[in-house]
Amino acid sequence: MSRRLFTSESVTEGHPDKLADQISDALLDAFLAGDPTSRVAVETLLTTGHVHVAGEVTSSAHVDVTAVVRRTLTDIGYDAATGFDGATVGVLVSIGAQSPDIAQGVDKAYEARVEGGEDTLAQQGAGDQGIMFGYATDETPDLLPLPITLAHRLAQRLSKVRHDGLLPYLRPDGKTQVTIEYDGDRPVRLDTVVVSAHHAADVDLATRLVPDIRDQVIAPELKRLAEENLGLEVDGYRLLVNPTGRFEIGGPIGDAGLTGRKIIIDTYGGYARHGGGAFSGKDPSKVDRSAAYALRWVAKNVVAAGLARRAELQVAYAIGKAEPVGLFVETFGTETVPVPEIARAVSEVFDLRPAAIIRDLDLLRPIYGQTASYGHFGRTLPDFTWERTDRADALRAAVGR
């Protein structure tokens, strides 16, 4: 089979764009905690000395936006030593109400307004038009592509050794990148790891940072991979640490951060398609978020059911309409039953109307802050209901297996 290289990247919680995502989702959680029916669309911009929060919110909850912003920044580790102090940074808030034109389509769907439908799950329309994708593959236990899985693990480890004090000279910002060699569609060899680690002054790259990153960040994760018996060759991989030579200036004083600029990191690392809609700061009435979560759930169950080794699904919505306007299933030749049968089974087992997604995945909860770094998919945390494989048996039954 043909051999090829594929690369995915991740970033730490202290990366400027991820700061923006985490602030937006912390605010979403705060509104949902006070009012589970809150409609929230919040964007965050960070730059030197300033945080600007803007968007639309309709909620009965009262939220101290500035306090949430400061707490998020300081919890991540932004203090005076980093040059961007969460306790003193300027916070500007520009939040209005959701447009009534949008609200009327969400509150009373096309099916109810025009067709007179009485099904309670048909009462809520999609919060916008758009296309969403979900993907799963059997190449890792998490049913996520290996490059993004390892990139996330390394980024999370980079933050952990900082928080735990193992590498106290590290600062919050950072990036990881992993290149894997594939033989056909199977990962076989680790080719390259890139780590960019934000650090204090007077840290020598060659004698301190590179050995520490290799021993404290990468080695534990390679050991974890070995324990998962993936058969990945890791000897002789290329390691690049801070290839510019220094990374003392980081966070929002090095680069501005903005909500929604890491959508490929948030999903499948470029291995699967993306509809273009960001997740963070959006309540689940926005199908950009809820339908993407639902399709990850569907794809994961298709693979767990043994109907295909790889599955990618697309769904499309019209604003204000409950029923999707389209569903597409792709299995890349790995299916064990005909693709039309898989598509029929998916439609039979899963209800992809917005209200049904919200009900089935229990999305009206303040759970979103933990999604905003290290990937929305691939982590089997208790609140990540879209990572369950609880409908694999139903899918098998639907195709007669």
UniProtKB/Swiss-Prot annotation:
Main location: cytoplasm
EC identifiers of the protein: 2.5.1.6
Gene Ontology CC: one annotated term: cytoplasm
InterPro entries attached to this UniProt entry: ADOMET_SYNTHASE_CS, S-AdoMet_synt_C, S-AdoMet_synt_central, S-AdoMet_synt_N, S-AdoMet_synthetase, S-AdoMet_synthetase_sfam
Manner of cofactor binding, per the entry note: Binds 2 divalent ions per subunit. Binds 1 potassium ion per subunit.
Biological processes, Gene Ontology terms: one-carbon metabolic process; S-adenosylmethionine biosynthetic process
Enzyme class: transferase
Highest rank taxon of the organism: Bacteria
Keyword field contains Cell inner membrane: no
Known catalytic reactions: L-methionine + ATP + H2O = S-adenosyl-L-methionine + phosphate + diphosphate
One Pfam short name: S-AdoMet_synt_M
Residues at which ATP binds: 15, 173-175, 246-247, 255, 261-262, 278, 282
GO molecular function: ATP binding; magnesium ion binding; methionine adenosyltransferase activity
Similarity section: Belongs to the AdoMet synthase family.
HAMAP family: S_AdoMet_synth1
Protein name: S-adenosylmethionine synthase 1
Species of provenance: Frankia casuarinae (strain DSM 45818 / CECT 9043 / HFP020203 / CcI3)
